[in-house]
A protein has these predicted regions:
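Conserved donor nucleotide-binding strand/loop of the catalytic core
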Residues: 41-71
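Cell-envelope/extracellular polymer assembly enzymes that use nucleotide-activated donors
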Residues: 2-4, 28
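Short, well-formed alpha-helical segments that are part of the catalytic scaffolds
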Residues: 7-25
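Catalytic-site signature of metal-activated, phosphate-bearing donor transferases
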Residues: 62-70, 88-197
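Acidic helix N-cap motif at the loop->helix transition within catalytic regions
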Residues: 14-17, 38-47, 91
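A conserved acidic beta->alpha catalytic loop
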Residues: 22, 32-43, 56-57, 83-86
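Short, well-ordered alpha-helix to beta-strand connector turns
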Residues: 26-27, 48, 76, 104
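Short beta-strand-to-loop acidic/aromatic patch adjacent to the donor-nucleotide binding site
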Residues: 70-89
């Protein structure tokens, strides 16, 4: 089974080493850098990632994710979308391979969105960014989700796989509001986007 991790990034050099170590169980790592000025693409390449640099104007997360997905080879069996401030607990690949089966479109796994000041897990929920290579695309300018061809995707839960989010608190999220407004304008009946707004 060929498993490929893909991601988008911009100025995330401090996370590169930890992230690449965590993703090393994959067969390949593909990254779309959207304009770093801190050496992120060079460091990722030194660590073995295949990096493409391309600005996205106007900025939309779905466009960036779709362009990063295009970097994944067509012969990949599974795609794993993560961000550079996320890390898998070791041993994730074996569990992902065991859970995958014909007819499955995506896998659901445990996601620790944040940690409390004392180090305990904060918000935890099921995440769904491990998916088949073909017949899906990212939608929504922000808080993007995968949309699958052919109706509702078949999902399977993976026990024992956990992705941890260690957010960069210094990064502004100021761009999110206009993107949320655009998302609601594009799809006013999308209750998820209305909720975020």
């Amino acid at each position: 089974m060929k498993i490929v991790v893909y991601a988008i990034c911009k100025n995330e050099r401090p996370f590169a080493d930890r992230w690449m170590a965590s993703m090393s169980e994959a067969d390949e790592v593909c990254v779309l850098d959207t304009g770093s000025t801190d050496g992120t693409p060079q460091r990722l390449e030194e660590l073995g990632a295949k990096v493409s640099v391309q600005g996205i104007t106007p900025w939309r997360f779905d466009v960036a994710r779709n362009q990063s997905l295009e970097l994944v080879p067509e012969d990949a069996d599974l795609c794993v979308c993560t961000d550079l401030d996320e890390v898998f607990q070791p041993g994730w690949r074996e569990k992902v391979e065991a859970a995958w089966a014909p007819g499955v479109d995506r896998l659901l796994y445990r996601y620790v969105w944040n940690f409390l000041p004392d180090g305990r897990e904060g918000m935890v929920f099921w995440y769904d960014k491990i998916h088949r290579r073909k017949g899906c695309r990212w939608v929504n300018p922000v808080h993007e989700v995968l949309q699958f061809d052919g109706g509702a995707p078949q999902a399977r839960y993976v026990e024992g796989v956990c992705l941890e989010h260690h957010a960069d608190r210094s990064k502004s999220r100021g761009q999110y509001l206009p993107l949320l407004e655009l998302a609601v304008e594009e799809d006013p009946n999308n209750d998820r986007n209305v909720h975020y707004l």
